[in-house]
């Protein structure tokens, strides 16, 4: 029996909301502020301070729409060999990378 598409979409949205709340729940506010600074300054040095692109591609909500969160986390942590995108795993753990992915996918511009 096939599941109606709208129910699948609702289920995926609910799972995404649960994932997002779980990611935020365990990162202290002070670290979230540090991560936003890293996103703005370090990532922004290549992707643009407003995330609209530069040396690296845009990191806007629209530009990342449809990209799997797991893939984005892997790029953040491990970089992209053969490109200027460096790995950030020395500075971030998986949970922090997931938090950054959430911020990017939601188009947030501040930590809170």
Where are these regions (language model features)?
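N-terminal secretory signal peptides that target proteins for export/translocation
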Residues: 1-6
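Glycine-centered loop/turn positions within well-structured domains
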Residues: 41, 57, 83
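Bacterial N-terminal signal peptides
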Residues: 11-20
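His/Cys-centered metal/cofactor-coordination and adjacent catalytic loops
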Residues: 25-29, 50-62
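Extracytoplasmic electron-transfer domains, predominantly the class I c-type cytochrome c fold
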Residues: 61-109
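The canonical Cys-X-X-Cys-His
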Residues: 39-49, 100-104
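Electrostatic cytochrome c docking/interface patches
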Residues: 19-38, 112
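Inter-heme linker and motif-flanking segments adjacent to c-type heme-binding CXXCH motifs
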Residues: 52-53, 106-112
